[in-house]
Amino acid sequence: MNIQLSPLEARVIGCLIEKEVTTPDHYPLTLNSLTTACNQKSNREPVLNLSEAEVQDTVEGLIARRLVSDESSFNSRTSKYQHRFCNTEFGDLKLNQQELGLICCLLLRGAQTPGELRTRTNRLCTFTDVKETEAVLERLANRDSGALVVKLPREPGKRESRYHHLFCGEVDMAAFATSSDNEANASSQYAELEQEVAALREEVAELRALIEQHLS
């Protein structure tokens, strides 16, 4: 896979993909609209507070790499931007609607489970069920031309593993595994504390019964 993005570039590309599908009448986006989309509180993780200057710098870098284009007319005072991230005439990256929806949501929110992705992509594409969502994710993870996503170690107490995109570089699997181990240890310690509290309550109840017998 040749496309590598910074976290801010991933946010900009994700927003352009999202708005192309969800608000086609207002696409391509002006700088103001794109900044608002980048700082949106819903369907964003983390929530950012970028200035227009920061977004402009990021967009200019993406334009230089031909991942974004300025579609404003010659006499227009306002620039309007659209992504050239995938499905362009001469580009190598081709994604169907389901694949694009998943990549978009992963760019905007980071690691998520198939169940979360199925719910959060409902305005971008349609999945019959979670199994279909996971099947498409596995296809993206096992592309002959290079994986676009990776399956992360399953978190303690969770039924599903999360998936993460690879457009910002390789994911530190050891860090995720350590995080999962830490959560498992914390859960184990919590269970031990619960058992100790239960035992102490029994002892208190027994002592209270003895005291009541003595007083009576």
UniProtKB/Swiss-Prot annotation:
Family matches, as InterPro entries: DUF480, WH-like_DNA-bd_sf, WH_DNA-bd_sf
Transmembrane residue ranges: none
Family annotation (Pfam families): DUF480 (PF04337)
Domain of life per record: Bacteria
UniProt family annotation: Belongs to the UPF0502 family.
PANTHER family tied to this protein: UPF0502 PROTEIN YCEH (PTHR38768:SF1)
The protein, known as: UPF0502 protein VC_A0740
Source species: Vibrio cholerae serotype O1 (strain ATCC 39315 / El Tor Inaba N16961)
